[in-house]
Amino acid sequence: MPRVHNIKKSLTPHISCVTNESDNLLDFLPDRLRAKLLPFQKDGIIFALKRNGRCMVADEMGLGKTIQAIGITYFYKEEWPLLIVVPSSLRYPWTEEIEKWIPELSPEEINVIQNKTDVRRMSTSKVTVLGYGLLTADAKTLIDALNNQNFKVVIVDESHYMKSRNATRSRILLPIVQKARRAILLTGTPALGRPEELFMQIEALFPQKFGRWTDYAKRYCNAHIRYFGKRPQWDCRGASNLNELHQLLSDIMIRRLKTEVLTQLPPKVRQRIPFDLPSAAAKELNTSFEEWEKIMRTPNSGAMETVMGLITRMFKQTAIAKAGAVKDYIKMMLQNDSLKFLVFAHHLSMLQACTEAVIENKTRYIRIDGSVSSSERIHLVNQFQKDPDTRVAILSIQAAGQGLTFTAASHVVFAELYWDPGHIKQAEDRAHRIGQCSSVNIHYLIANGTLDTLMWGMLNRKAQVTGSTLNGRKEKIQAEEGDKEKWDFLQFAEAWTPNDSSEELRKEALFTHFEKEKQHDIRSFFVPQPKKRQLMTSCDESKRFREENTVVSSDPTKTAARDIIDYESDVEPETKRLKLAASEDHCSPSEETPSQSKQIRTPLVESVQEAKAQLTTPAFPVEGWQCSLCTYINNSELPYCEMCETPQGSAVMQIDSLNHIQDKNEKDDSQKDTSKKVQTISDCEKQALAQSEPGQLADSKEETPKIEKEDGLTSQPGNEQWKSSDTLPVYDTLMFCASRNTDRIHIYTKDGKQMSCNFIPLDIKLDLWEDLPASFQLKQYRSLILRFVREWSSLTAMKQRIIRKSGQLFCSPILALEEITKQQTKQNCTKRYITKEDVAVASMDKVKNVGGHVRLITKESRPRDPFTKKLLEDGACVPFLNPYTVQADLTVKPSTSKGYLQAVDNEGNPLCLRCQQPTCQTKQACKANSWDSRFCSLKCQEEFWIRSNNSYLRAKVFETEHGVCQLCNVNAQELFLRLRDAPKSQRKNLLYATWTSKLPLEQLNEMIRNPGEGHFWQVDHIKPVYGGGGQCSLDNLQTLCTVCHKERTARQAKERSQVRRQSLASKHGSDITRFLVKK
């Protein structure tokens, strides 16, 4: 192989970041980014720059490759646009890092590709973030756009995703990376187990540098002919000449280990825990081993497919056989209340067994497997990192073993092994990375007499190969063997059986009518029952329960929430919110929906109007409170008025809180005094008034220390020194823009000029100002930012999402929301969803008005009518129909069509199904698949699916509200997950003392038999469909738990019934109540 032998190794120049020369080389970086870099990270950036921006950064996991790549590409920002290719679950963390370290980029300049047709903003964005999952053979529109864009700078994160020469994503990415002028490949495991996995990455950076594939395979992969049965096969899975390969790689790859450059990081301690399995648990596995030995004794006795199928079956049987012992081990670890740890597994059966162990121990946990969406994974990671009550993370080795940070954990348990050391080390370093403050203990559970012992030996052999190739020395997974006597209890573990849905449930596992009659809602013990009391909603009861418990609690900042974990306790709350959520005011309007706010504002404002008259009333004893509606003095323990049954929390005000409140009717004459007088109102009243009259509060320019203190956003005394600064001009007003993809808020001047800084509102609430320059410690700026954070926090998550997606610049988020709402088209539709028939009618009407024709598009782009079709340039056949005759066909068979009827204008441009505007130019339409040209933009696509597809609608609402009821704040999704993952025999106990006890018997038993999300929470229309709220956007939707949804539906049904009766009565006579109305 002459090309390989003639390679001249370029010695890596010795670079020390202590010298002034290296510091001068990094002067181009933003000050904050340069100050954050560690010395070895500066070395990595300079290494790449000296190779003209084409290299591989292969530092060990957890050493900060992301920030190095950002620094490298920033040097070449004049050559952007920049393409960043990452695993799909890391799109948003990468976007967060880009916005954090390059604040000069505006939100509009960063484009996160959402689907295979989302290419409209690619040509106008400076940074494009793309997930590997979209690089498939059918993504023709996306592939064409990537090739046409000609990205000059490319980052490929976790570049070992390109290890296979035959994978579609490798073939798509290879020409894009080769064509780019600068290309940075990032991976902590360039080769997961074999040298063959390096070839595609090297070929992407330097084509033909190591020769052709056959030359490389023969030289470094020990390629040879091998027979599987009678079939010869070219085997490239070996390794040879590894020292030479290591020397050649050092010219294009920089790799540092944590033991070399991060000596202050606490150590990683591995421990191997072998144990014996009970004979009953390993019965099936022993049978498979006998079959395996029979095949191995007979040469050429089985085909490759048979052998691999047997190994896969043994792998799964090993998981089931050791699941009982793994459960006992997890329970043993949970006995230490101070431990937070990760559990990694591969098979769903093992993940299920681990989850059951945590549920049986009544511990809060998170679980990430392949079914969890990318956005939800980030939410779960934040929960584990920040919530001290979430002690266990149950993770899939493949789904959560790369790119995520779990430094809050001090222990890692491997319930199963995997086939290569790369995945194992990646999983280990989720906890052992920069930011870890304690040593990480890693436990490998090895079941003797199973596939584990064989896999452990295989992992060490592969580790020697990868260590020699990447690090220049032989390595193995160093793990001390644990004390056998200490783990003897594992061999006595009970055999575990999968939670099979087809298993027949015993009668004891289901609710019966007798038990249902005995059930009591736990909240009934805290609420006195008068003789005549109307039925109250679950929202009112739960909210009152939280408020009462908040008063009694020693920590007034914590919300007493309902707990679904300790379900056997008679006095436990029903759900436990995240710590972050608990830090907010317990009566914050951000948790209220528009409909709820509307119900609460009216009596509250009325009570303010009556306050003036009550000021002259003398103070009452402490044990009583006065109703503001009927003035009756009630016992302090009653949560509602004994006379008029008005709830104490909504329309009643304590006498001692009614100081200096003016009549609402005088507000118009003295608007300047309103903001000062509102300060004396209680928190709930102040926030409700802020929602009812946002304009006044937004226009108020006086921000007194008292309001700041009430919101928990006080200025530090030491900050008074920042009264003047020459580094930044002082503006009396700031503009803001919310990022579309992260929680960050970008700051602009009042003229709309970007100030190259951004922040996270939650950080400001926690008094963390490190993301902002020191100049923003000025008192004027602090006041403006604090005021923004207060207003922003008062909005619900759904309202914040509306502002983010708008991309607008604004001063006040409340006023911005009002402006966006005004601009939206007001529609009054009593139909729930858009149907294909609605689309067909709209398309035909468009064609009749402006000309053109209609066509039937399907996902397969197959012709539906052989008589009316047109052959496009790329050979795809799409039927073109006559708009005057197709309507009759649709009325005969309205739901048999698998596609949509789309209008095409006279120029041949297909029109958007949502807005009837051209989706693309004619030349592009010929190249694109007809199915990809349904919509003109991602916005129209989302709006269309939200209005026509229930599953898509639920998914989008879930992304924002995470399955938390917006009326009673119950985390219904968490209860669903616990019930789904629990053994069927224990599901009844889980449901027994929760908010679901109000549901009918059959519904409860269905939850036990076959739990689904729809049994626990629903997406409800705030403005009901019958009232004109159908086919709405997300701002008219909210999450409701099943109980609240049922009660709200019943209330709405009663209202509709009354309206119908009144309408019917008005046809035959006049309503007598009209004579009683005062004119």
From Swiss-Prot:
CDD domains: DEXHc_HARP_SMARCAL1, HNHc, SF2_C_SNF
Zinc fingers (RanBP2-type) by residue: 621-650
UniProt modification remark: (Microbial infection) Methylation at Cys-630 by enteropathogenic E.coli protein NleE or S.flexneri protein OspZ: methylation disrupts ability to bind 'Lys-63'-linked ubiquitin.
Domain Helicase C-terminal: 325-481
Location of the region described as DNA annealing helicase activity in the Swiss-Prot/TrEMBL record: 46-481
Keyword presence, Glycosyltransferase: no
Purpose: DNA annealing helicase and endonuclease required to maintain genome stability at stalled or collapsed replication forks by facilitating fork restart and limiting inappropriate recombination that could occur during template switching events. Recruited to the sites of stalled DNA replication by polyubiquitinated PCNA and acts as a structure-specific endonuclease that cleaves the replication fork D-loop intermediate, generating an accessible 3'-OH group in the template of the leading strand, which is amenable to extension by DNA polymerase.
Protein name: DNA annealing helicase and endonuclease ZRANB3
Organism name: Homo sapiens
Taxon lineage: Eukaryota, Metazoa, Chordata, Craniata, Vertebrata
